[in-house]
């Protein structure tokens, strides 16, 4: 073999980016994701219109929804989107904040890399900074009691503000607090799945209502059944009210017409016995997860029982929690003690569709919010805002800690981190300072999105916090002044902030550790590992 003969390890159809090129490319991809959602941050943030291949439209300023709906191919960009998804899953809000901070951390890291600071030193500095940031956040956090509905209402309204439900935020905030406090368990934990969100267009957002029970998007199986039952005794069945067919292919040959009548009568008797069992238990309302035979429907209507069939499993679980009923899998086992109770069970027409309302439950551990809106797009955006607000109220009840909003927490963190950086030796000090500067992207962006002078606002905020004991002063985007955010009712759960900063830092560190990107091009005529045109990141590259 000749000494100068090249050794080919990777095939020709593979793109490879190494060292500084790989880092620069990944940083750029992450920054673009941050910039994409940055204009949506805060109560004065703008909305994005997302259109798919079929022409379906989503209009939203919810960070995680924007990123989920975007067609992103770049692997580094996908990692940033995971930050938003994690934030949504863990706390329900703060997704845009997390991604914007991550984008700014990457920008600051790139500046340090350009100054020949090694990536591992940047990572070490960021780790020191995030650790200190978590300590400072705990110090400036305020305690809140789980039954302090006034504070919880303010937290809900802070989350809703600027998300398409502005006019009805007072009412929605009250409903959300009522809903979340209703489903808190003995240990103080909140299962958000027990709050059902039902959407119906055809009315204004003001007509949104909270039902202390469950709303089922079904109608009664027979018009002969009563439409409304008061003092309802509710049976929940996870078995069909039908004659069970045999699994074998056996045939029954009938030669005598009387035998046929006996056969039919026997089937009728079986169905009648099932209905009699339901009646004997004392039930006057039946929710069945499976089917109900036509003849059984007739017998149930005759007995004055309101029945609903093919109810979703998730709805059955909520009905059980709301009414106290047990889900019975064999109709023969149905007893009076398995029944649940509700003040009213009624079929009503909402936007032309029949729906079953199970209301006035004594101690409902499952509730429903019926979201109304003039169009589908309005309803979807309000539902997203409500879902986020439910998440932050739940966090507050579980943790009992809140911080000031309006960029107050970030400015205080930045100030404390700069002081902390003085005691950090080596080049890590530069990374801690860069981290502090990066956190100020939140108040800066709030000011920009409100049409204010970002530099002027930052100077005012820094000056106010430097006076001491002013950790709660942030930017009021409606007046353009630096004000006490706690007095204005602009507060957020501590967990939203800690999770956003932690997730953003971890994603940044992961991207900075990458110094080699190997991607196979899409093979013609077959499926390949296409990761987009990763070299062309000057614009949006292969990301969208």
From Swiss-Prot:
Q: Which PROSITE patterns match?
A: TCP1_1, TCP1_2, TCP1_3
Statement: the UniProt record of this protein carries the keyword Iron: no
Q: Which cysteines are joined by disulfide bonds?
A: none
Q: Show which residues constitute the signal peptide.
A: none
Instruction: Name the source's superkingdom.
Output: Archaea
Q: How does it assemble?
A: Forms an oligomeric complex of eight-membered rings.
- Purpose: Molecular chaperone; binds unfolded polypeptides in vitro, and has a weak ATPase activity.
What family does the database annotate? Belongs to the TCP-1 chaperonin family.
Name of the molecule in the record: Thermosome subunit
Protein's organism: Methanothermococcus thermolithotrophicus (Methanococcus thermolithotrophicus)
Q: Specify the taxonomic lineage.
A: Archaea, Methanobacteriati, Methanobacteriota, Methanomada group, Methanococci
